[in-house]
């Protein structure tokens, strides 16, 4: 049972295995509780949630139509004494819209963890994303390119921060340090 001493409530669509390092670091260094969805339409390996100090609950992702889904028991979390809500920046999650609405009314801060703008959005997607992202207090996006595109769409640059991708950077450094130049590609393709 959550004691709500944490000031940050993280509600994500799922806890993927590749985000284990960043979630573990957040869990050990920040006052945050974690709530993860149970499944996606495309199966993906989940991390071991018990590794997190403040894993609170797995929420059921109920798919309604196409990619749109509702996260059961997520909306009630906005009425808990958290100060910040970190959500996937996914407009397909309909319960996130409701959380954003209530958070605004209750004067709570919301942060999107998202790819942001890709640059190939249709007019309909642009309108939906613009409305959705405008509901957040702040946006954490993966790249400067997304920030550039979103600022052209009217988003305030001061409310966006580039967090790069959430892959295991420390492990990638170790792997890259062991790599060496090879002719395997040019030899195989004769170029």
Q: Can you name each region flagged by the protein language model?
A:
Residues 51-73, 87-89:
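A short, charged, and often flexible helix/loop element on the N-terminal side
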Residues 94, 106-127, 135-138, 142, ...:
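A short, histidine- and acid-enriched strand-loop-helix "catalytic/donor-clamping" loop
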Residues 13, 37, 89-90, 113-117, ...:
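Histidine-centered beta-alpha loop that forms part of the nucleotide-sugar donor binding/catalytic region
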Residues 1-59, 80:
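N-terminal subdomain of nucleotide-sugar transferases
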